[in-house]
Curated annotation (Swiss-Prot):
Cofactor(s) recorded in Swiss-Prot or TrEMBL: [4Fe-4S] cluster
Broad EC category: transferase
Cofactor remark from the record: Binds 1 [4Fe-4S] cluster per subunit.
Pathway noted in the entry: Cofactor biosynthesis; NAD(+) biosynthesis; quinolinate from iminoaspartate: step 1/1
Chain positions recorded as iminosuccinate binding sites: 81, 99, 170-172, 187, 255-257, 272
Annotated SUPFAM superfamilies: NadA-like
The protein's name: Quinolinate synthase
Keyword Electron transport annotated: no
Native source organism of the sequence: Rhizobium meliloti (strain 1021)
Compartments where located: Cytoplasm
Length: 359
């Protein structure tokens, strides 16, 4: 008797086809500052004229013009974090915001292509939430000190050490770390996320200062990890007190990635969007934003009459994103962001739990 094996052989995984192969490469356009380019970008220059001298705009405008034309041709949308420079934030971005805003808005875009003007974990988050879309980051080396402070293996060891304790992971982490966590958080919703969990003890990783600051707002026991943002950890309480002494009446608005001693000196603390809304609503006569200094420039045009004191701590990773690199990304469809399918579903679940959390 002959036995037939009717089981089908497993189909081989589909061959990877690069974004450049899928969408094609476009030849670099002429980047001359022509009268037509000047006219078509004039309204955008009005938004950044306080930060870019008129004689320098001739170098920016051709890139702005080309990017805005190409993103329509490519059916692409540009997402930019609040720490991007004003030329990107005001002149080419379609959606701007903090990490939570960008994560939520990434799920609503109709475009085929997402250009993520931020650091790599943000692009990964957009890819997790849009697995069928093409996500590009203009510079794949745009990293993050927080993201690099912890690995998925570290989280597994923490789970062994603290069995049954839920893990809340800051979005400033790799997909591999997110895959080992229960739910993600951002600086704008970390307290709501922690309070949503039934456990009296919560692991809040990897930002030690964010965890310490939320511990002051909850009755839960917060376990921490020693990760720090290289921008925010440089601020000190003594520095801010010196600013207060030198500028009577100044309001200090801080980010919760700063040390709790720094936050104690602040008049308000919140996510980058929370900080922006505070300044827009309160309209203080003079204000100091304790965060990456490009953000003050980005909102200065919208709050005329507010004097910004700028202790300039720049994020070297955010500053890797530039107009020439964005243009190159659109022309050559690089750098494409991919997430290992073995971890993507678990990482996506942690992000979706955060995005869907009612606040």
């Amino acid at each position: 008797m002959t036995t037939l094996d009717l089981r089908k052989e497993a189909a081989p995984p589909p061959a990877f086809v690069s974004a450049a192969a899928r969408f094609g490469v476009i030849e670099k356009p002429d980047l001359a500052f022509t009268p037509a380019v000047a006219r078509e970008t004039e309204h955008l220059y009005e938004k950044v004229k306080d930060f870019i001298p008129a004689f320098e705009w001739a170098a920016y405008a051709p890139y702005v013009h080309a990017i805005n034309r190409l993103k329509k041709e490519r059916n692409a949308v540009i997402l930019a974090h609040n720490y991007q420079t004003p030329d990107i934030f005001h002149c080419v971005a379609d959606i701007v915001g903090d990490s939570l805003q960008l994560a939520r808005d990434a799920t609503k875009v109709d475009a085929e292509i997402i250009i993520q003007c931020g650091v790599h974990f943000m692009a990964e988050t957009s890819k997790l939430l849009n697995p069928e879309k093409t996500v590009l980051i203009p510079d794949a080396k745009a990293g993050c000190s927080l993201s690099e402070s912890i690995t998925g293996a570290d989280v597994r060891l923490l789970r062994e050490r603290y069995p049954g304790v839920p893990v809340v992971t800051y979005v400033n982490t790799s997909a591999g770390v997110k895959a080992e966590t229960d739910i993600c958080c951002t600086s704008s919703n970390v307290l709501a996320v922690v309070e949503s969990l039934e456990s009296d003890t919560v692991l809040c990783i990897p930002d030690e200062y964010l965890a310490m600051n939320v511990a002051r707002q909850t009755n839960k026991k917060i376990l921490t990890w020693k990760g720090h943002c290289e921008v925010h950890e440089r601020f000190t309480a003594a520095e801010l007190l010196a600013y207060k002494e030198a500028n009577p009446g100044i309001e200090i608005v801080g980010h919760p990635e700063c040390h709790p001693d720094v936050i104690a000196v602040c008049d308000f603390s919140g996510s980058t969007s929370g900080m922006i809304n505070y300044v827009k609503d309160k309209r203080p006569q003079r204000v100091l934003l304790v965060t990456e200094c490009s953000m003050a420039s980005n909102i200065q045009a919208e709050v005329k009459g507010v004097d910004f004191v700028k202790p300039c701590n720049l994020c070297p990773h955010m500053k890797r994103i530039t107009l020439p690199k964005i243009l190159d990304s659109l022309l050559n469809m690089t750098e494409e962001v991919l997430v290992d399918p073995a971890i993507a579903d678990r990482a996506r679940l942690a992000v979706e739990r955060m995005v869907n959390l009612k606040q």
